[in-house]
Amino acid sequence: GEPSDIRARCAAGIMLCFDTDSPTLDLTGRILTGARTYAGFDVEVDGRVIEAHRIDTSPETRTLRLFDLPAGPTRRIVVTFPQSAIVELDALTLASGSKAAASASNRKRYLAIGDSITHGMDARGPSSAYAVQLARLLDMELLNVGVGGHIYDLEALDDDLPFKPDLVTIAYGTNDWSRGTSQAEIAATVKQYLTRLLESTAAAASVYVLTPIWRQNGDEAKPSGTLVEFSSAIATAASTFEAVR
């Protein structure tokens, strides 16, 4: 697969939320190849997805009309940016004479930690990623730090993360299993990871560990067992923490 630094530069869960009476919104910039050679922008108006743009990446500067609506009252707009490409943004342009303001929000905060599944790689569109869907369902502000290929890694934790979440989900394990990590090793790492997370970023948060659910070769017999057996080791380790579900 792609090096992790390429996927890390493809930010996931980036959403532009604002209220406007403008009937149009144009985006000017470059949509560069990242983890994929295509990208998507999903546009939601007053809670309903009305546009799902799918375009090929290119180093050329282009202007994309994100929406074109009938003239009307102020609407709440949410634009979800690509999770698989790199966006170099030059300008966002509203119709002449229109007004816009950031959408008022005192929502609680959700931190999604994980690998490519959390990142939303190969989802139908950027708003189809489960972290985006969950944030929308719970009406929470999302910070998605999922990166393809990542594992339970203590060095990846940011103890000084300025984003203070109310909810944290951690979804690792499938890449740990594919790398041959033993059940004893993953259990020890999960305990160290959760201990540190609960003492820092997630000190005031509800924390949920999501174990791997499925992968195509999950029934393969590895020294660490099948993926289901490996997942059980993660769940058992996580269950030793009262604050973790």
What residues fall within each predicted segment?
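N-terminal secretory targeting modules
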Residues: 1-110
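Alpha-helical cap/lid subdomain in secreted, periplasmic
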Residues: 9, 22, 155-245
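Short hydrophobic segments within beta-strands
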Residues: 27, 113-114, 210
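Residue-level signal for short, function-critical loop segments
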Residues: 31-33, 116, 174, 213
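Short glycine-/small-residue-rich flexible loop motifs, especially phosphate/cofactor-binding loops
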Residues: 40, 132, 235
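Residue-level detector of flexible, active-site-proximal loop/helix-junction positions
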Residues: 57, 117, 149-151, 214, ...
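Generic structural signal for beta-strand residues in well-ordered domains
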Residues: 70, 103, 135, 199-200, ...
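Serine-esterase "nucleophile elbow" of acetyl-processing enzymes
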Residues: 78-148, 153-164
